[in-house]
Amino acid sequence: MEQPEALSPTTNATASIDQRIPILHAVTSDDIILRSDFTDRVRRVKHAGGPRVAVHLRAARFSARYLFDLACQIAEVQTETGAWLIINDRADVALTSGARGLQLTSRSMAPADARRSAPHLAIGASVHSTDDAARAVSGGARWIVAGHVFETESHAGEKGRGTEFIGQLASEHAIPVIAIGGVRPEHVAGLRAAGAHGVAVIRGVWYASDAGAAVIDYLSAHGAPGGQ
């Protein structure tokens, strides 16, 4: 199986790395993965976004074998389109499926440990505070997904950290900051102005009637071209 191109950890490569990190991250859930049309939607998302989009395979209830089989299917679309497949939390699946990246959370191994175990993978980290971000960056994360920025259904009643949080992280760290949490296309310009490299969404893509069109909406709001 062809391995994805490694991203150099050296600081003088920051500019080129920043350009290669996708600007739209479409994050899944167990319920989304179980939909009968999930793989078809993945294909539409990846073709619409090309290398500017990443599909995050995030699941809590499935076995490693199930996720591995699913990831291998999605990795084939990655090769066709240049779009990224990123596995959340499960380093074993990321290592063996042909995924391009690994997204770490507070429950995962540290970024530094992941880099030693999987030097060819691009590694990001999910953060919820400035301290989280500092630890992730010092451990070698190549990007951070930060939130939640706006109120979401999964955090109902909890005030979002706001655009200012993204701006603070972007000013403190020379790696891409990806904003997550209730982000709609109309929020993208403001987040980008604050310093966000891109955005991560769940409902905005996977619950849209046309997932491919939703991708184009987000990319257009960012000012980036789509895929194929």
Task: Give a label for each model feature.
Residues 1-104, 108-111, 116-142, 158-161, ...:
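Conserved N-terminal beta1-alpha1 strand-loop-helix module at the mouth
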Residues 94, 150-155:
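A short acidic, helix-capping loop that chelates divalent metal ions and anchors anionic groups
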Residues 153, 200-201:
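Residue-level signal for pocket-adjacent positions within structured domains
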Residues 167-168, 180:
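Strongly charged, low-complexity linkers/loops
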Residues 179-183, 201-203:
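Glycine-rich beta-strand-to-loop/alpha-helix junction loops that act as flexible
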Residues 194:
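C-terminal binding/interaction regions
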